[in-house]
Amino acid sequence: MATEGDVMTDHLQGVERAAPGEVRVRRALLSVSDKSGIVELAQGLAELGVELVSTGGTARELAGAGIAVRAIEDFTGFPEMMDGRVKTLHPRLYAGLLARRDEDEHLRAAGEHEIEQVDLVCVNLYPFEQTVARGDASEAEVIENIDIGGPTMIRAAAKNSAFAAVLVDPGDYQQVLAELRESDGRLSLSTRKALAGKAFACTARYDAAISTWFAAHEGEGFPESWRESYEKVTDLRYGENPHQQAAFYARVGSPTHLLAGVEQLHGKELSFNNLLDLSSARELVEEFAEPACAIVKHNNPCGCAIGDSGREAYESAFACDPESAYGGVIAVNRPVDLAFAEALGKQFIEVLLAPGYDAAALEALQVKKNVRLLELSDWPEPLREVESKPVIGGQLVQTHDVVAETREQMSTMTARQPTEDEWRDMLFAWTVCRHVRSNAIVLAADGATIGIGAGQMSRVDAVRIAVQKAEKFRGGRESDPLAGASLASDAYFPFADGPQLALDAGIAAIIQPGGSVRDEEVVAAVDAAGAAMVATGVRHFRH
C-alpha cells in the first residue's frame, strides 16, 4: 500500500519528456467561482485517476461531495493569505504550468526544484461584471471582485497549450471528459488549442470590463485608450446583403442588450436588417410613457404616433406612410390585443415587438407565416451608453445623444406664441426627429407624424419630401392634415426656403435649434405667415 511519501515520489517522477501531441492528464487544478458542473467534472477526472488540486471554496465544495482533493497550500508549500488575495501566485504552480516538456533544460530545472507538472487547469473568474451590473455595489466591493490569480493561471495554461489544457466554460466540461475517456486520459492538441483560444478570449473580455469600469470613474472626457469587448449572442444568416457574413454580439459589461429578455413567439430567424430596424424602433417608442407605436424601415421611422391605445397609435403611425410601412419593423409599448392584431390586417410586416400578446391576438397573427413576433415583457430603462461608429482603421466615439430638454428651456423666436396644441405637436415631432437620419424633417398633427423627410443632403429637400408625403397620404385624414400642423427640424434652417415651403403648405408651428446667420430671414418668413417658431438651442444630427 502506498504511503504519503510514495505519493510524493510519484509526483517527482511525473516530470517527464513529452511531445506536444502526447500529453496525458494526470494532475488537474480546479479553482472556480461559478461552481456549476464542477463536482461532476471532478468526479469524472478522479475516475480517470487524475490527481485533483484545489483552492478554498472549490476544495470545500468537492470535499463536501466526497471527492479527494489536495489543497493548494500542500501543492505550493505556501499558505493562502490576505483574505485569499494570495493563494495560487507561486512559482511552484507556474513552473508546473509553463514547463516545456520537450526541453531538457525545463525538465532539468523542474527536477532540481521538485516541480510538479499540472496538465489541466479549470478556472473561472470572480464575478466582476455581475457585481458592476448590480448597480448598487460599492467601489470596494467592485475592486475585491477583480480576480488576479485566476487570469494568471488561465493565461499560463493557455500559453502552454502544447502541453497543458485550460477550461474556462462549464459548457465544455462534459465534452472534455468524453474525450479523455475515449483517448486513455489524453486531450488532442487541436482540442487544447481551441480551449486556449477560448481562454484568452475570456481574459480579454474580463480585462476589457475592468478597463471600462475604471475609465468610467476617471472623470470627464474619454480615456487615452479605448477598449471594449463583445460576446457573441447569435450567428445571423447573412448581413445587410446575402453575400455578407454576420453575427450579433452584445457588449461585455452592458446591463442589457437588444435581445435580452426578448422571446420570439413566431416566425423566421431575425436578420441583420431586422435587428438594425428593431433597435431603432424600440429606442423610439421607449421615449414615450403613453401608448406609442413606431414603424421603421431601413433604420428610419416611416410613421410614429401616440394614442389612447396601442391599436390607435399603430393606425395613426401607419397612416403617415402606408407605402413605406410595407415590410417594416413595428414596436409598440403596450400589449397587443385582438383589435390590434385585426388592425394589422393584410399588411406585410417583418417584425412586431410588444410587451405581450393576448391569446386571441397571437392566434390571429400566427396566420402570417413569416412575421417575427417578439415579446419583451419587462422593458428595461433605456440605455444611455457611449456609442461608437467605425471609420477606416478606427472608431469615432461619442456620448449618447441625450440631453434634458424642457419647454421652459426653449425660446419663442416669432411674434406669435405657440398654442398649447401646437406645443404638444412640436414637442412630439421634436422627439421623433431625433431618431430620423439627417437631414431630418418631421411633420406632426394630433400626436402623430403625417410626413417625414429623412436622410437628405439638402434640408429644403427633406421639407419637400415630408410635405409631399403628407399631401399624398393625408395622415389617413379626410381634411387637410397640413393645415395647422407642426414641423420639427433636427438642425437650423440655413435659408428661409425650407420653412417657406412648409408654411405655404399650411404648417402653423416650427421647432428647430436656431443659430443660423440667417435666423432673422427665417423668422421674418414665419412672422409673415402668422405662424409660430421655437428655438431649442440643441441640434440632433443623426448619421
Model-identified regions with their sequence ranges:
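Anion (oxyanion) recognition and catalysis
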Residues: 46, 63, 147, 158, ...
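Glycine-rich nucleotide/cofactor/substrate-binding loop typically near the N-terminus or early
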Residues: 57-128
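Active-site/ligand-binding-proximal alpha/beta "capping" segment
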Residues: 101-151, 155-158, 406, 411-420
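Short, hydrophobic/aliphatic alpha-helical segments
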Residues: 39-48, 129-146, 151-152, 281, ...
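Non-catalytic interaction/clamp surfaces of large macromolecular machines
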Residues: 171, 175-225
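N-terminal glycine-/serine-/threonine-rich phosphate-binding loop
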Residues: 2-75
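ATP-dependent carboxylate/acyl-activation modules
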Residues: 9-30, 123-126, 206-208, 212-543
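Mobile "lid/hinge" segments at catalytic clefts and subdomain interfaces of large enzymes
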Residues: 152-153, 160-176
